A protein has these predicted regions:
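Juxtamembrane interface at the cytosolic side of transmembrane helices
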Residues: 360-386
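Juxtamembrane/start-of-transmembrane alpha-helix segments at the extracytoplasmic/lumenal side
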Residues: 337-356
Length: 386
């Protein structure tokens, strides 16, 4: 499934690209449309990215299965592209997810004037009445409702609600007719009488009957980035949004699927690491042809395992992943050996260079300063005219 993500989606701080790399069913296109966390694209750079990567017409927009909007600078978008996004959702039935409750009026103001805002099941005006507050820590409360798809409930026995704080959110309020999957509990806004508000909201929208989502926690907090090392099943939840919006059923054994996604994440990380080591060794003249061939085979095994996973052939996929991990270990050992041999020659050449330079310097000093072989006494002279 193709995912179009726009706004604050730079890979230096946003995990969306990593999610789509780890999950075999997802393929992402990023449209960075706001500078954040020390990025320095500038208006010219952002407009160029939008021009290059945002679909130029409705037909191209409909090539995507899911659209994610995370606080872009709406003013930088061509007006027709915003209308195309709206039509892709409202009439084309494409799923979508947004976080737009910025603290800055130049972000949320133009957004609220678009028709696209109407697609999403939250009431931004209630957030503004609180003064458009920033992120605050919250504890998670999952809605138990047998009529809802099991997006998060399978992780309750595993202690997902015991992670405190679960993330950092901004007060978000559902529109009438919306469905709430999880809630935030926090006393950070108790002065305004708000101690409980939705975390994930959804509804069906438009003639296309699109399943559309809102999150109260933007994509650079601990909930999504898991930067404290605690398992929040963020990849599983994110993938669940997209699968449900695309008409896919959630897995019957979500814990097994979670473990497989972890395996894909680790394997692809190792493939990237090995590739970097091989490239490093190659830059020093090492013969990397054989190990590169094996790396190509490893990448093929990763793809085959992904295809089996998508066909729900989990036993075969796990078996293929086991073979892939064995091959990855073999390639890692060979590539490290190549690197060490290449560096041995580098160190040897450096040692010989330093040693020869020191030897030549020593000979020169001995000759000039000790033996004084180049020394000649000054001859006596006489003055002209004597």
């Amino acid at each position: 499934m193709r995912v179009l993500a726009m706004g604050e989606v730079d890979t230096s701080y946003c995990p969306i690209w990593g999610y789509c790399e780890a999950e075999p069913s997802l393929d992402a296109t990023l449209v960075v449309a706001r500078d954040m966390h020390a990025t320095t694209y500038g208006e010219t750079g952002l407009r160029r990215i939008i021009r290059l990567y945002l679909p130029r017409n409705l037909q191209d927009m409909l090539e995507y299965d899911f659209i994610l909007i995370n606080q872009p600078v709406v003013q930088y978008f061509p007006p027709n592209s915003l209308q195309d996004i709206y039509l892709a959702v409202a009439e084309g039935g494409r799923g979508a997810l947004c976080f737009m409750e910025s603290q800055y009026s130049d972000i949320y103001g133009p957004w609220l004037e678009t028709q696209l805002y109407d697609c999403f099941p939250y009431d931004h005006s209630k957030n503004l009445k609180l003064g458009a507050p920033g992120d605050k820590p919250f504890d998670l409360e999952i809605v138990r409702d047998a009529n809802l798809p099991p997006l998060m409930t399978p992780y309750v026995p595993l202690g997902i609600e015991n992670i405190k704080p679960f993330g950092e959110a901004r007060p978000t309020f559902e529109r009438p007719g919306a469905t709430i999957f999880a809630r935030c509990r926090t006393n950070a806004f108790s002065g305004a009488g708000v101690t409980n508000f939705p975390l994930f909201i959804s509804w069906r929208y438009g003639p296309g009957n699109a399943l559309v989502w809102v999150t109260a926690d933007q994509f650079d907090t601990s909930m999504w980035r898991t930067n404290d090392g605690k398992e929040r099943y963020a990849l599983d939840i994110f993938t669940g949004f997209i699968w449900l919006s695309s008409g896919w059923e959630l897995p019957d054994d979500p814990i097994r699927v979670h473990m497989m996604r972890d395996s894909f994440t680790h394997l692809r990380s190792r493939i990237g690491l090995v590739g970097n080591i091989i490239e490093f060794a190659d830059s020093f003249g090492a013969n990397t042809r054989q190990v590169q061939t094996k790396l190509g085979g490893l990448q093929l095994m990763d793809k085959e395992a992904g295809d089996l996973y998508l066909d729900h052939e989990f036993d075969l996929a796990e078996s293929k992943m086991g073979e892939a991990f064995d091959l990855a270990s073999e390639i890692e050992a060979e590539s490290v050996a190549l690197k060490e041999r290449a560096l041995t020659w580098v160190y040897l050449v450096e040692w010989l260079t330093v040693t020869s330079t020191a030897a030549l310097s020593g000979v020169a000093i001995w000759s000039l300063m000790v033996k004084r072989r180049m020394f000649h006494p000054v001859s006596a002279t006489r003055r002209v005219g004597d």
